[in-house]
Swiss-Prot record:
This is Probable dolichol-phosphate mannosyltransferase subunit 3. Stabilizer subunit of the dolichol-phosphate-mannose synthase complex. Pfam families: DPM3. The chain crosses the membrane at residues 13-33, 37-57. It comes from Caenorhabditis briggsae. It is found in: Endoplasmic reticulum membrane. Disulfide bonds: none annotated. It is a multi-pass membrane protein. Keywords: Endoplasmic reticulum, Membrane, Transmembrane, Transmembrane helix. Belongs to the DPM3 family.
Amino acid sequence: MASQLIIYSAHVVLLVLVWLLAYTEVVPVLSYIPECAHCLVYYIYAAFNVIYGVATFNDCAEAKVELLQEIKQARAELKQKRIID
């Protein structure tokens, strides 16, 4: 199973490669759309990438339970040392 860094890096490398090919006009994609839309296409891709990342974010129930237990333990220690009420 690939780590998230490798998956993210693959997406970034692919995006940069496609952008460079279009920017250097090796692939004349950018000549078909107005110049003001070049950034818009990039922004749409960036927004989609963020939305996709949020939608596929894994919820770890075990980590949540462990974190809540550590918070309770820390509060108990702080109360014992009379730092908090």
